[in-house]
Swiss-Prot record:
Cellular localization per UniProt: Virion; Host cytoplasm; Host nucleus
Gene: M2-1
Descriptive protein name: Protein M2-1
Site entry (Involved in RNA-binding), positions: 8-9, 92, 151
Assembly, per entry: Homotetramer. The homotetramer interacts with RNA. Interacts with the phosphoprotein (P); this interaction is required for protein M2-1 function, localization in host inclusion bodies. Formation of a complex host PP1/M2-1/P allows P to target host PP1 phosphatase to the M2-1 substrate. Interacts with the nucleoprotein (N). Interacts with the matrix protein (M); this interaction directs M localization to cytoplasmic inclusions comprising viral proteins L, N, P, and M2-1 and mediates M association with the nucleocapsid. Interacts with host RELA. Interacts with host PABPC1 (via C-terminus).
Gene3D superfamilies: Pneumovirus matrix protein 2 (M2), zinc-binding domain (1.20.120.1350)
Organism: Human respiratory syncytial virus B (strain B1)
Function description: Acts as a tetrameric transcription processivity factor that binds in a competitive manner to RNA and the phosphoprotein (P) to prevent premature termination during transcription. Transcription anti-terminator that enhances readthrough of intergenic junctions during viral transcription. Preferentially binds to poly(A)-rich sequences. Plays a role in the association of the matrix protein with the nucleocapsid, which initiates assembly and budding. Also, can activate host NF-kappa-B through association with host RELA.
Lineage: Viruses, Riboviria, Orthornavirae, Negarnaviricota, Haploviricotina
Length: 195
């Protein structure tokens, strides 16, 4: 059996060509230098994903600096409202990142209180449960939640964002003492101006 050259895609991660690829995917056939390159690449990938100082969010989900500029100017709620209203050229990516940040701010216990006040057959219960499930998913893995939100059709995403914003406003009305996302954004801006 003749030794084939190692697949360059497999060396640098994973080959997507499947059976069409004519190069070797059998690591036992590979020369030592190819194995070392693959091992080095995989170790760097693991190290990068574990390093908290590197902004993996922008690399993995595409949350670029432009999105953060919009968020700084408009605030999280402003970005989401702009996306719903199709103004300020807010991208789906920006909206999903802002939505993830809003979900961090909302306490699921507050939503459960609102849900318990509803009639048993109210359609709002389903909306509350959906938002609660997004909050719990976001707490476990916010990058995966951003990815799930991005996969929603635009109209469904807009409806989900609108429902979440409505719930957020209801919580603020029922708990006026708690600081809101907008208040925190304003406070950050004031600190930047004065500091």
């Amino acid at each position: 059996m003749s030794r084939r050259n190692p697949c360059k895609f497999e060396i640098r991660g994973h080959c997507l060509n499947g059976r069409r690829c004519h190069y070797s995917h059998n690591y036992f056939e590979w020369p030592p230098h190819a194995l070392l390159v693959r091992q080095n690449f995989m170790l760097n990938k693991i190290l990068k994903s574990m390093d908290k100082s590197i902004d993996t969010l922008s690399e993995i989900s595409g949350a670029a600096e432009l999105d953060r500029t919009e968020e700084y100017a408009l605030g999280i709620v402003g970005v989401l409202e702009s996306y719903i209203g199709s103004i300020n050229n807010i991208t789906k990516q920006s909206a999903c990142v802002a939505m993830s940040k809003l979900l961090i701010e909302i306490n699921s216990d507050d939503i459960k209180k609102l849900r318990d006040n509803e009639e048993p057959n109210s359609p709002k219960i389903r909306v509350y449960n959906t938002v609660i499930s997004y909050i719990e998913s976001n707490r476990k893995n916010n990058k995966q939640t951003i990815h799930l939100l991005k996969r929603l059709p635009a109209d469904v995403l807009k409806k989900t964002i609108k429902n979440t914003l409505d719930i957020h406003k209801s919580i603020i009305i029922s708990n006026p003492k708690e600081s809101t996302v907008n208040d925190q954004n304003d406070q950050t801006k004031n600190n930047d101006i004065t500091g």
